[in-house]
Amino acid sequence: MKLLVLLLCLGLTLVCVHAEEASSMERNFNVEKINGEWYTIMLATDKREKIEEHGSMRVFVEYIHVLENSLALKFHIIINEECSEIFLVADKTEKAGEYSVTYDGSNTFTILKTDYDNYIMIHLINKKDGETFQLMELYGREPDLSSDIKEKFAQLSEEHGIVRENIIDLTNANRCLEARE
């Protein structure tokens, strides 16, 4: 009987933990809760040069502001060894949970997973000059995240066809933290 109660408690705990995660493609997703300060933790792509040093997609998020039908984003990027700011506005598309933004081509993205308080996992498709690549981004509310969340991100990236060699942990890289206001 005690084992049955223990298993029931464990099952309910797993249901509660699972319920806290959300995706922008789900009806229960609350975009307002992603508003605020974020840090780029990891990047993954099927075109590695895009996220290596001096790569155009090696950008470091500072914040996401939720607007009526769009997201205002502030990033930092290192150009000529100096941190520069980039401000972008991503507009909702007609597809549920999808946003589009122009930066180094045409991009559409969705938030695959978030618990709102700790992390966001984003999947982006970039199209430029007839070529397409995908980018996965892991943002955290703090400058670093647990190894469990990082592993969950790596597994999600692999599910999207990105090999481990193309997943970069940026927590020890220059992320322009000194440029944040």
Curated annotation (Swiss-Prot):
Report TM segments.
none
Keyword ATP-binding: yes or no? no
Tell me the PROSITE patterns matching this sequence: LIPOCALIN
Q: Which GO terms describe its cellular component?
A: extracellular region
Q: Which residues form a coiled coil?
A: none
Molecular function GO terms recorded: mating pheromone activity; pheromone binding; small molecule binding
Q: Which coarse location class describes where this protein primarily resides?
A: secreted
Q: Which domain of life is it from?
A: Eukaryota
Q: Please give a single GO biological process term from the UniProt record.
A: positive regulation of neural precursor cell proliferation
Query: What role is this protein assigned?
Result: Male pheromone which stimulates female sexual attraction to male urinary scent and promotes a strong learned attraction to the airborne urinary odor of an individual male. Promotes spatial learning by rapidly conditioning preference for its remembered location among females and competitor males so that animals prefer to spend time in the site even when scent is absent. In addition to promoting a rapid attraction response, also elicits ultrasonic vocalizations and urinary scent marking in females which do not occur immediately after exposure.
Write the protein's name: Major urinary protein 20
- Where does this protein come from, organism-wise? Mus musculus
